[in-house]
Amino acid sequence: QDKGDYWWELRACDYYDEFEKPKIIYPNILKRPEFTFDIKGWYTNQKCFIISIDDKYLLGFLNSKLNHYLFEKYLPKLRGGFYEPSYVFFKNFPIKKIDFMKKSEKLAHDEIIKHVDLLLQLNEELKDTKLPAKAEQIKQRIAHSEEKINQLVYQLYELTPEEIKLVEESVNG
């Protein structure tokens, strides 16, 4: 039986076990891509969505400037410049599938994962850092890894310098 005897006894979630697995978590309303990776089995409420997949390459793409640009093209804009990346709109995003037979794509994929792992580590360090100078140093390393991921994503999507400029101006402007 999946519901209780009284109205306040809500039925159990059919996908509880998905919360225990590695997954990508993101808020249901956001201004820019804010995706994180969970390996600790965090549970979320209705204010967040989860993507039940252990895929740090996808996490790197989702937080990239190119994905931010795609937000502007595919997602409806809410008041205040916010977006609601629900599945209905998100399912049409052109996420690059890696051809592992192509050495350049495999290398870019592996580099993205390396930088995502570094970013996850650096963000943990930043949370624990009390010294302003150390925090600034970590922030610079974070910015460097984010930029490396952006360049790798541009490479995978074979963007021209003009297209890269368009993306950069759109999300930085």
Regions found by a protein language model. Give the residues of each.
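Polybasic, glycine- and aromatic-enriched phosphate-binding surface used to engage nucleic acids
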Residues: 1-104
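Non-catalytic DNA-recognition/assembly elements of restriction-modification systems
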Residues: 95-173
